Design a protein with these regions (language model features):
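Non-catalytic cell-wall polysaccharide-engagement segments
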Residues: 2-51, 99-110, 114, 118-223
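Active-site histidine-acidic residue metal-binding/catalytic motifs
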Residues: 58
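Short, charged helix-capping/linker segments at alpha-helix termini
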Residues: 62-71, 126
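Residue-level detector of well-ordered alpha-helical segments, enriched
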Residues: 69-74, 88, 130, 134
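Glycine-rich, acidic and aromatic/proline-enriched surface loops and short helix-turn segments
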Residues: 76-85, 140-143, 223
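Glycine- and aromatic-rich loop/turn segments at beta-sheet edges
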Residues: 85-96
Length: 224
């Protein structure tokens, strides 16, 4: 009987330890800003095999830039930018002032991760914790983060649309992506892609955990 109990405990303990460790990381990774009371977890969905083959390299450079928790966001960006099939998979050449498709695959991922990290840092410095500002800025450039910082500090489609309208001088082009067709009949302003957040987020499942929920799960796990 005692041996059976030991075996049961030995089986359950690693699982409980993993739960405690996971949620402990969530809490420790909280932003210092007390207004940000949620811990987002990003999981990828419907990513193609061509994109997933780049995951090890994305993980490597995400880790180097301190953004490992955003690996699935970066993979979703690759899905939108190139489907994982172009050489410059993250289309990050232009963030270096280079012509499009100037970088090799590894150079593209290295620069894409570095650029994303710089945008994330810039947004946090401006008091913004909305990941969608970072995502849209990856497409528009850092000027969009400045624009949002002066207009509520939270991304919205209307802000993305108005930013593109101003930058394009109001010039519209046909855009037949299903998301655009559903939203406005199939057009966008001729500057970047005002639907970029929607395009990326269709490949993400974003869950929010409140501090209270995380703590409750940890307390329950520790009972055992």
């Amino acid at each position: 009987m005692r041996l059976k109990r030991i075996l049961i405990i030995g089986t359950i303990f690693p699982v409980l330890f993993s739960i405690v460790l996971f949620f402990g990381i969530l809490i420790s990774g909280e932003d210092d800003d007390s207004s940000n009371s949620y811990s987002p977890v990003y999981s990828g969905m419907n990513l193609s095999a061509d994109v997933l083959k780049h995951q090890p390299m994305v993980e490597k450079y995400a880790r180097e830039n301190g953004i490992s928790e955003y690996v699935n966001v970066l993979l979703a960006i690759i899905q939108v930018e190139s489907g994982g099939t172009a050489t410059d998979v993250m289309q990050s050449s232009e963030s270096l002032g280079l012509p499009p498709n100037s970088l090799s695959t590894e150079e593209s991922i290295k620069q894409g991760c570095k650029y994303f990290a710089s945008l994330l840092s810039s947004c946090k410095a401006k008091g913004m914790n909305d990941i969608n500002v970072v995502i849209q800025s990856y497409n528009y450039g850092g000027g969009y983060a400045d624009y949002v910082a002066k207009n509520g500090k939270k991304h919205s489609f209307n802000l993305a649309e108005n930013f593109a309208k101003n930058k394009s001088g109001g010039t519209k082009v046909t855009y037949t992506n299903p998301i655009a067709v559903s939203k406005n009949g199939g057009w966008r302003y001729n500057y970047g892609n005002m639907f970029y957040v929607e395009l990326v987020n269709q490949y993400l499942n974003i869950k929010q955990f409140s501090n209270e929920t995380v703590q409750a799960v940890m307390n329950e796990a520790l009972k055992y």
